[in-house]
Every structure is written in structure tokens, then in C-alpha cells.
Amino acid sequence: MRRSGSAWWNTWNAYDASFSYMLPVKRGEPGQLLSSMRFHTSLLLAILLALATLQGCSLLRLGYGQLDHIAAWMADDYFDLDHQQKDEFHKRFARLHEWHRYEQLPDYAAFLRDIRGRVEKGLAREDVVWVAEGVRARYRTLARHGADDAATLLLTITPQQIEALKRQWGKDNRKFIREHKLDGTPQERQRARVKRALDQVTDWVGSLTPEQEERIAALVTAAPSIQPLRHEDRRRRQREFLALLEQRANPAEFPARLRDWLIDWEKGRAPQYQRLQPEAWENRIAFLVAVDRMLTPHQRATLTRRLQSYIDDFTRLAERRGAQTTAQ
């Protein structure tokens, strides 16, 4: 029996929309990872985001320690891997995991420390832009490092496994439509947007006052919705990935093509979506700055404590095993 990994894969929404939304994932409700199917480089980033929704530091550390098993489970859920492919996935992902843990997590901790410092002072427009650029840079580092191994694995994917992937994508797309009320009335879509924003803010800063909720709802309502275009862009990325798999006849060129596709993920957007991106991004910046300015001292302290908990987790995870034993 195949297992459902959609909840884990769905973490991609937090990254896929990070440059137009830049709000962390809601605890217990990760976003949509497979919207663009960046396979095993995005897989690592997505699981990190999913682990960040766990309650408590020890759970995050436990989840990251089992990352290779979680990743294999997720890949199998989408591709229905055979035994040989699973073994190869474990071997290659273990190398990526080792590199990421000891080379990248210290940088993530430093990045979060800088974010925490900016949050403590109060966010300005340039701070939000800086965070977005930092996320982009770290994604590209991950994509460049993992693209060759991902390409090697993708060369083994069969037509039957591609059909399994399409079926799983169909489920993901239907879930996106359902959660964002794309098949509902404009009023239903608006209510869903407001609820999602309130849930995300509350998850990071704690309870909101009625006045804050009203102000946040007004900010969301004032900004035009681009969810239908986002959905179409997800499907565009899925089509591109399938087209990329058709180019595997030349194994020597495929890794470079995959790497370019992973990094230039905005290339090929529909003209209307591309045209609206600058406005959507500016709206999101204004939203985040406005929310930051309405935070009470207690809410700001809640946010900085949560950021610090992730800093502590990443720092501890990046310690070599010998150092951890000594510290204990």
C-alpha cells in the first residue's frame, strides 16, 4: 500500500510563495512543496521547513536526525521507487544531508540571528528584502550542490513512475484549489486569504487583539489576490519538469539542464503573472512592515523567542557527534 506524504511535501508553499508572501508556515499546516518538483534539493529545504512546524526543539532535532528516512519515504510516495532506486536514493541523499548539516546549518543559524536582531529593532522595507534575498541565495546553494545527484536518480525514473508522479500531482493540485477556495466565490477566496494570514501571524507572535485582527484583515483584503495565477504557475512548473524528463536521452547534458531549471525557477512565467509580481511583492513587504509595527512588546518577544529556538536547534544539529557527547 502506498503511503500519503502530501502533508510533508506540501511544505513547499512556504518557500514557493516566500518571495510574494514571506510569512513562515503555519504550525501543523505546511505549504505546497511539489508545486515545482525541485526533487531532492528542494526536498531537503522543504523538510527543514516542515520540521520547523514541530512543537519543541527536541522534536525538530529528532526529525532532522531522521531526515534520510523521511526523504526516502517522500520520494517513494511520489515516484513509487523500486528497491534499487531506494538504495541509491539513501546513498546519495546521505551525502547531501551530511554536507547540509555541517556546512549549511551554521550559516542558517547565523542568518536567523541576523533576522532576530532586525526583528528586535523593528522591520523596515530593506529588512524584508534582505531576508528574501537571503532565502534565494541559500536555495541556490542547495540546488547547485544537489543537482548532479538528483539528475543521476531522475535518469532511472520509468514511464510508469512518471504516471505515478502525475497522479500525485493531481491530488496536490486539487488540494491547492480546495484550500485556497479557487473553485468558490470571490468572498470565499477572500475569507480563506484572511484566515490564512491571521493563522500565520498568530502562530509566530501569539494571540492577536480584535483590533489587530481587523487591521490585518483589511491589509489582506486591500491587496489583489493572485492565487489563481499561482495555481497556474505551479502547473506550469509541473509541465516544465515533465518536459525536462523527456530530455534525459543525453545523460551528459541532463544535469546542467536540471541545475538551470532548479535555479531559474521563475523563468517562463505567464506574462500576466510576471507583470503582477512586482506589485504583489511590494504589497507583501508593506503587509509585513505594517504587521511588525502593530506588535506589542509581548508579541515581539514571542517571535524572537521562537527564532532563538531555531537558532539553538540548528547550532546543536551542526555540532559534530564527538562535540555533542562532550557537551552532554
Model-derived features with residue positions:
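Tryptophan (W) side chains
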Residues: W8-W12
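C-terminal motif of bacterial Sec signal peptides marking the signal peptidase cleavage site
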Residues: L54-G56
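Extended amphipathic alpha-helical interaction segments
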Residues: A150-A270
